[in-house]
C-alpha cells in the first residue's frame, strides 16, 4: 500500500511541475508571435506568390493578437512561467509592447522594400518574428539560462536579417561584422554568467543578488564587468558601439529600423533585470560605470554624427547618443528615472521609425542614401519632407514634439537625483544633435530649385498603387502624427510609464532601498 502511494506521488509531482513550468498565461503574447512565425513559414512553402499574399495578414494577426494579450495582462496578477525563469510584470509588458509595435511598423515599411530587392517576403517576415520572439522573452527573463537563450535567439535572427540582401556586398559585410562582434559578446556574457553561478550556486537572478549582498567578492566585481559589457554591446553604448555604424549602413533599412528600436528596448530591459535585480550589492560601482558610458555615448554619438554623409550612418550615431540619454534614467534608479526610461523608449519608437519610413520611401524611389541627395526634396515630395522634418525635430527634442517631453522628463529625473554632470552633458549634446538634424531639414526645404540634387531633379512620379506602398504610407503617417501631436496629449504616456514602474516589484524594491540609503 505504501509503495502504491509513493508511486502515485511520483506520478503526480511531474504533472504539477509541468503545470508550473508551462504557465501559458504569462507567455500567451509570445505564443501568438510564434504561431505567426510558423504560419509565415508554412505559406512560404507554397510558393512566392502565395507567400507574398498571405504573409502580411498572418503577421498582422499574430502581432495584433500579441498587443491585445499584452493589454489584457497590464496591471493584472503578475504571472511567472518556465519554473520562474520568466515573469510578466508591468515592466516586461511595457517593453514587450514597444518591441511588438516596432516589429509591426517595421513590417509595414518592409513589404515594398523586400519586393523591390527581390527578397523572399515569407522568410524575411519569419526571421524578423523570430528576433521579436527572442526580444520579448528577454524582457521578462529572470534566470541566466533564459537570458542567454533569449539573447541568442534575438542575436542569431539579427545576424540573418543583416545579411539578407545576398547580392549586396555591404549587407554581407555587415552580417559578418555583427556575427563576429556578437559572438564575442555572447562568450563574454557566458564567462560572467559562469562566475555568478560558481559564486551563488544558482542561475536565478534574485538568488544571485541575495548571495552577492551577503558576501560580495572580487569575482563578483569581475562578473559585473563581463555582464555589463554584454549589456553595453546590446544597447550600442560607447566604447562597445563599433559594430553599429557599419551594420546600420550595410543592412536592409527595415532591419535597421527594428534593430534601432526593438533590439535596443530589449537591451535596456535586460540592463534593468540584471543590474537592478542582480547587482544591487554593487549599485555604486555599476552606476559609476554607466555614468561614464552615458557621457561617452552622448558625446561621441552626437559629435561624430555631424560628419556623416550617409543618412543611415547619421542615424546610427544618433542612436548611440539616444542610448546615452536613456541611460540617465537607469543611473538615477528612482521612480522618475525608471518611468522616464520607459516613456522615452515609447517616444523613440515613433520618431525613429517615422524617420526610417521616410528614408525607405526615398530609397525606393531614388536608390540613394546620401544626405546631399535630399537637397530640394520639398519640390518633388512634400510628404517625405514634412514627415522626416517632424521626426528629426522630435529626435532633437524641439517642443512641442513628443521627443521634447521624453527628453525633459529624463533631464528632470536626473537633476532631481543630483546627476548634474549627466544632465549638463545631455543638454549640450542635445544642442549639437539639433544642428545636424536641422542641417538635413534645411537642405530639403531651403535649397533653391536650381540647387536641387541630380537625384531630386530626376525624381520619379509618386505612385501609391504599387503593392506594398499603401502599408508604407500608413506607417509613415501614423508615426509622424504620434510624433507631432503626442507631446500635446502626452498624459496617457506619462501614466503608462508610471504604471510600468509601480506594477513591477523589482523596481519598487530598488526604489525603496535607494530612498532608505539616501535618508541614511
UniProtKB/Swiss-Prot annotation:
The chain crosses the membrane at residues 26-46, 54-74, 91-111, 120-140, 144-164, 179-199, 220-240, 252-272, 288-308, 314-334, 342-362, 386-406, 421-441, 474-494. Keywords: Membrane, NAD, NADP, Plastoquinone, Quinone, Thylakoid, Translocase, Transmembrane, Transmembrane helix, Transport. It comes from the Bacteria. One of its GO terms (cellular component) is plasma membrane-derived thylakoid membrane. Pfam families: Proton_antipo_M (PF00361). One of its GO terms (molecular function) is NADH dehydrogenase (ubiquinone) activity. InterPro entries: NADH-Q_OxRdtase_suN/2, ND/Mrp_TM. The keyword Transport applies. The keyword Thylakoid applies. It is an enzyme of class 7 (translocase). It is a multi-pass membrane protein. Its EC number is 7.1.1.-. GO terms for biological process: ATP synthesis coupled electron transport; photosynthesis, light reaction. It catalyses: a plastoquinone + NADH + (n+1) H(+)(in) = a plastoquinol + NAD(+) + n H(+)(out); a plastoquinone + NADPH + (n+1) H(+)(in) = a plastoquinol + NADP(+) + n H(+)(out). It is found in: Cellular thylakoid membrane. NDH-1 can be composed of about 15 different subunits; different subcomplexes with different compositions have been identified which probably have different functions. NDH-1 shuttles electrons from an unknown electron donor, via FMN and iron-sulfur (Fe-S) centers, to quinones in the respiratory and/or the photosynthetic chain. The immediate electron acceptor for the enzyme in this species is believed to be plastoquinone. Couples the redox reaction to proton translocation, and thus conserves the redox energy in a proton gradient. Cyanobacterial NDH-1 also plays a role in inorganic carbon-concentration. Belongs to the complex I subunit 2 family. This is NAD(P)H-quinone oxidoreductase subunit 2.
Amino acid at each position: 500500500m505504501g509503495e502504491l502511494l509513493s508511486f502515485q506521488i511520483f506520478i503526480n509531482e511531474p504533472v504539477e511541475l509541468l503545470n508550473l513550468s508551462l504557465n501559458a498565461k504569462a507567455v500567451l503574447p509570445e505564443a501568438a508571435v510564434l504561431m505567426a512565425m510558423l504560419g509565415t513559414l508554412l505559406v512560404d512553402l507554397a510558393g512566392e506568390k502565395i507567400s507574398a499574399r498571405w504573409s502580411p495578414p498572418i503577421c498582422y494577426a499574430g502581432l495584433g493578437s500579441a498587443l491585445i494579450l499584452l493589454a489584457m495582462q497590464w496591471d493584472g496578477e503578475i504571472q511567472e512561467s518556465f519554473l520562474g525563469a520568466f515573469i510578466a510584470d508591468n515592466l516586461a509588458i511595457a517593453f514587450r509592447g514597444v518591441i511588438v509595435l516596432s516589429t509591426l511598423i517595421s513590417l509595414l515599411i518592409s513589404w515594398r522594400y523586400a519586393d523591390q530587392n527581390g527578397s523572399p517576403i515569407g522568410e524575411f517576415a519569419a526571421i524578423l518574428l523570430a528576433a521579436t520572439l527572442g526580444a520579448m522573452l528577454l524582457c521578462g527573463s529572470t534566470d541566466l539560462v533564459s537570458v542567454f537563450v533569449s539573447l541568442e535567439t534575438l542575436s542569431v535572427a539579427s545576424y540573418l536579417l543583416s545579411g539578407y540582401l545576398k547580392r549586396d556586398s555591404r549587407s554581407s559585410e555587415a552580417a559578418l561584422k555583427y556575427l563576429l562582434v556578437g559572438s564575442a559578446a555572447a562568450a563574454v556574457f557566458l564567462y560572467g554568467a559562469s562566475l555568478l553561478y560558481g559564486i551563488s550556486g544558482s542561475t536565478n537572478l534574485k538568488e544571485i543578488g541575495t548571495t552577492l549582498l551577503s558576501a560580495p567578492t572580487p569575482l563578483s566585481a569581475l562578473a559585473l564587468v563581463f555582464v555589463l559589457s554584454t549589456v553595453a554591446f546590446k544597447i550600442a553604448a560607447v566604447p562597445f558601439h563599433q559594430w553599429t555604424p557599419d551594420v546600420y549602413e550595410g543592412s536592409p533599412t527595415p532591419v535597421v529600423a527594428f534593430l534601432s528600436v526593438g533590439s535596443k528596448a530589449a537591451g535596456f530591459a535586460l540592463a534593468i533585470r540584471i543590474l537592478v535585480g542582480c547587482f544591487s550589492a554593487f549599485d555604486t560601482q555599476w552606476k559609476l560605470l554607466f555614468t561614464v558610458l552615458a557621457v561617452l555615448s552622448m558625446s561621441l554619438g552626437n559629435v561624430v554624427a555631424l560628419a556623416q554623409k550617409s543618412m543611415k550612418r547619421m542615424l546610427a550615431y544618433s542612436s548611440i547618443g539616444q542610448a546615452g540619454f536613456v541611460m540617465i534614467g537607469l543611473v538615477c534608479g528612482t521612480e522618475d528615472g525608471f518611468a522616464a526610461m520607459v516613456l522615452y523608449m515609447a517616444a523613440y519608437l515613433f520618431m525613429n521609425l517615422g524617420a526610417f519610413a521616410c528614408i525607405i520611401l526615398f530609397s525606393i524611389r531614388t536608390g540613394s542614401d546620401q544626405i546631399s541627395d535630399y537637397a530640394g526634396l520639398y519640390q518633388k515630395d512634400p510628404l517625405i519632407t514634412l514627415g522626416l522634418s517632424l521626426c528629426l525635430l522630435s529626435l532633437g527634442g524641439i517642443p512641442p514634439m513628443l521627443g521634447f517631453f521624453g527628453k525633459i522628463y529624463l533631464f528632470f529625473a536626473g537633476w532631481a537625483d543630483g546627476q548634474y554632470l549627466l544632465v549638463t552633458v545631455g543638454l549640450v549634446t542635445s544642442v549639437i544633435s539639433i544642428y545636424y538634424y536641422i542641417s538635413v531639414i534645411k537642405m530639403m526645404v531651403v535649397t533653391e530649385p536650381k540647387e536641387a540634387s541630380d537625384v531630386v531633379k530626376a525624381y520619379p512620379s509618386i505612385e501609391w498603387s504599387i503593392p506594398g506602398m499603401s502599408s508604407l504610407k500608413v506607417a509613415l503617417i501614423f508615426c509622424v502624427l504620434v510624433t507631432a501631436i503626442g507631446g500635446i496629449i502626452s498624459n496617457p504616456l506619462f501614466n503608462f510609464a508610471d504604471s510600468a514602474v509601480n506594477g513591477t516589484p523589482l523596481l519598487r524594491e530598488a526604489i525603496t532601498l535607494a530612498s532608505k540609503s539616501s535618508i541614511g
